[in-house]
Structure formats: structure tokens, C-alpha cells
Amino acid sequence: MTLGLNITHQNKENKTGRKTIGNIVPDNWVYVQDRTVKMGRFQIYNNWSPYLVKDLSHTVWMGLEYFCNEGDRMWTMEDADFARRAIREMVTLKLIDEPSKVLDYHVERVKKAYAAYFDTYDQIDTLVKYLNTIDNLYCVGRNGQHRYNNIDHSMGTSFEAVKNILSGRTDKSNIWNVNTEQEYHESTNQENEVEVD
């Protein structure tokens, strides 16, 4: 689940030396490692693109991400209750001073947001072959390709799809080949495992 927030102030000042609009921290997303909150990650949409934010000089759009399961206690919370909880966590993390800094919010529940690599996943190539027979279907992003891609790779699949549409290219292998280079992925080799006594 994600809570999108438009806030008037962000307490985290940019001390990196990297220039940002409004001198906000330059990160796109930050993983939260604080056991006192349930938030898993927050995003700063201003840093994705300044065109996503109407008033760059005075506001920051953030997304607070929570990892939960469809139908569980968090998933079924009323939007206002979920927002209050998340905003309290922003105060706890000192991202904002007080709840009144929040101008607006939007709750988004994304079903099956993460790809699952079990059951019949070993037959994904058969599915891809079939999907590629549908001329005007371009499978992009995490859910479209059922892959655990980062946002840059997910956006890359969209860019490739647009290139194909504009050029009339019918072979979709370039779209499916985004993020298939193995050196990027975490190693699963036993030689890299650490033995613990």
C-alpha cells in the first residue's frame, strides 16, 4: 500500500552537495530501518521529475510504502485511519514536525505488487511467447512482465515499448530483455555465501 502525501515542509535538509530544487534531500526513495514504525520505504516524487509537482518551491510530494497482504488488517483499514497512522510515523521519523504539514493525501492499494517466482513460473517463457503473438499488447513494468524490477527498469520497458510503437517494430524482445543482464542481479552462487558458526 502507498500513501501519497503533499506536504508543505520536509525536515530532511540536503547536505550532500548535490543541487536540488528547494534544497530537499536528493534521494528518490529511502528504505526505512526503524523498528518503531511499519513503513518500509518512502519516495520523494519531486526527485523523480519536477514536472510531477505543481508547486516545487513550497511543497514536496512523498509516497510512504507499506508492505502488507491483501485482506490483512492494514489492507482493510479505512483510508483516513491509514493516513493518520502513516502521518504519525512521518512525525516519529522526523520527516515532518506535525500532521498539519500535510496538505493532501491519496491511498493506493496495489494487488500483487511483487512478482512471485514459484508454482508455474518456470513456464514463463511459454506465456511470453503467447503474449508476443498479440500485436498491440506490450507487457511493461513489474506487473506487466511479472518481474521484480526496480523502477528504472520498469520505466525502461515502457520506453522500449514506445520506441517499438513509433518505429513499427513488431519484435518485442527488446522490451523483455530490459534488466536481464545477470551482473546486475544479486548473486545466488554458493561461493559468495558466508558460512556462519
Q: What are the roles of these predicted feature ranges?
A:
Residues 96, 100, 168-171:
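Generic macromolecular interface patches on structured domains
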Residues 1-95, 173-183, 190-197:
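Mid-domain catalytic core of redox enzymes
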Residues 106-108, 117-197:
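C-terminal lid/capping helical subdomain adjacent to the catalytic/cofactor pocket in oxidative enzymes
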